Structures are given as structure tokens and as C-alpha cells.
């Protein structure tokens, strides 16, 4: 049913692969067991599943998940998601992907193609629409940054990587201790930096 094809990337809590699942192209995230912080690894895996039943054009969809893994693998579980490509907003902004390398409209010869006003507005609207939907479902991302916004071949932005997300009850986090597994310090909301509770 599941056949891994090629690695797409890796991060603090796992690796992502391009794969096929029942004949469809998907992305597979294998969440690794952390010898240093098992609780954080477990929290990251379950946080990814906060969006498991949600479907929205601007959110990467979870197709399936499993906690079954061969003993030989150092894995807590596997999450199968829709494949949206390997281009992120980070690649587009900083020109770090071959698909977005210098073009004829390279302004200033800095080695990257500048975003047009139309692209900027489109991407911003996609991200805000995705965030508004997540917040309406009581989910806060807590690690929203350009590297976690994927851009499809059709130019649609999809929010992904929910390893730090929280499901809020009545619009408030249950604990002031948020995102135990990290998140990206330089992209945190001011209320998180102040140690306040998360709200949507």
C-alpha cells in the first residue's frame, strides 16, 4: 500500500518522503523517537494529527496515520499527507530552490526572482484564509513561517507542518506552557515570547 520513493527533507522530529499510497502520490512524515526528549517527540506526532479530519484548500491534508513501525525503525509513527510539492514560501522569498532561481525579471541581479505584487497578494490571501479556517476550528499553528507554507504547482499556498500546533478548548490553551517541543523562536507571536496563554 505504501511505497517510499525519495527523501524530501528532514527536521528536528522526523523525515519527510515522497511516496505512493494506494497508487496516489503522497508525502510521508516519519516521526523519529528522540533519545533526548521522548515526550517532545510524542507531542509533535500527536500535534500533527490536530488537522487530521480537516479539509481546506489552504491546509495540507492528512490522509492517514499509524503508530505501527518495524522494530528496526527508530520511529514513533507515520503520517501520510497530500503531496503538495517541495517548494515553500521560504524558497520563493530567498531564492533557494532551482524552481525559483534567477530569471529575466531578476531585479538588481541578486540571484533571485522578485515576487510580483499579484503573487504577494495571492500568497497573503491564501495564508490568511488558511489561518482563519484553522482558528475557526480551534487550532493554532505556533510555528508559522515561510518554510512551513508550501506552494503547489498551481500557485496555491498551503499551511503545513503542524508539529507544534495546539487544539484550543473554548478559545484558550489549557496550559501557559506552549509548544514544549520548540517552534522557531524568530517567528513566535509576541504573546508566546511573554509567556502568555495561546488564544485564537
From Swiss-Prot:
InterPro entries reported for this sequence: Kinase-like_dom_sf, Prot_kinase_dom, Protein_kinase_ATP_BS, Ser/Thr_kinase_AS, Ser/Thr_Kinases-Pseudokinases
Glycosyltransferase listed as a keyword: no
Reaction catalysis annotation: L-seryl-[protein] + ATP = O-phospho-L-seryl-[protein] + ADP + H(+); L-threonyl-[protein] + ATP = O-phospho-L-threonyl-[protein] + ADP + H(+)
One Pfam entry name: Pkinase
UniProt keyword terms in alphabetical order: ATP-binding, Kinase, Nucleotide-binding, Serine/threonine-protein kinase, Transferase
UniProt-annotated binding residues for ATP: 8-16, 29
Enzyme nomenclature, EC number: 2.7.11.1
Domain Protein kinase: 2-200
SUPFAM superfamilies: Protein kinase-like (PK-like)
GO molecular function (one): protein serine/threonine kinase activity
Residues at the active site: 143
Similarity comment text for this entry: Belongs to the protein kinase superfamily. Ser/Thr protein kinase family.
PANTHER family named among the record's database cross-references: SERINE/THREONINE-PROTEIN KINASE TNNI3K-RELATED, V-MOS MOLONEY MURINE SARCOMA VIRAL ONCO HOMOLOG
Designated name of the protein: Serine/threonine-protein kinase mos
Source organism of the structure: Apteryx australis (Southern brown kiwi)
Amino acid at each position: 500500500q505504501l511505497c517510499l520513493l525519495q527523501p524530501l527533507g528532514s527536521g528536528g522530529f522526523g523525515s519527510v518522503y515522497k511516496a505512493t499510497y494506494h497508487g496516489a502520490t503522497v508525502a510521508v512524515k516519519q516521526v523519529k523517537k528522540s533519545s533526548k526528549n521522548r515526550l517532545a517527540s510524542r507531542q509533535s506526532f500527536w500535534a500533527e494529527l490536530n488537522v487530521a479530519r480537516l479539509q481546506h484548500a489552504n491546509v495540507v491534508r492528512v490522509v492517514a496515520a499509524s503508530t505501527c513501525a518495524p522494530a528496526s525503525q527508530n520511529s514513533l509513527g507515520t503520517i501520510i499527507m497530500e503531496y503538495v510539492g517541495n517548494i515553500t514560501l521560504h524558497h520563493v522569498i530567498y531564492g533557494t530552490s532551482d524552481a525559483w532561481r534567477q530569471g529575466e525579471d531578476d531585479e538588481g541581479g541578486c540571484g533571485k526572482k522578485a515576487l510580483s505584487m499579484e503573487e504577494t497578494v495571492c500568497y497573503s490571501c491564501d495564508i490568511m484564509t488558511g489561518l482563519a479556517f484553522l482558528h475557526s476550528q480551534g487550532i493554532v499553528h505556533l510555528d508559522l513561517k515561510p518554510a512551513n507554507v508550501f506552494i503547489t504547482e498551481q500557485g496555491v499556498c498551503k499551511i503545513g507542518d503542524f508539529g507544534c500546533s495546539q487544539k484550543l478548548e473554548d478559545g484558550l490553551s489549557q496550559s501557559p506552557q506552549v509548544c514544549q517541543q520548540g517552534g522557531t523562536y524568530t517567528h513566535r507571536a509576541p504573546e508566546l515570547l511573554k509567556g502568555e496563554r495561546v488564544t485564537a
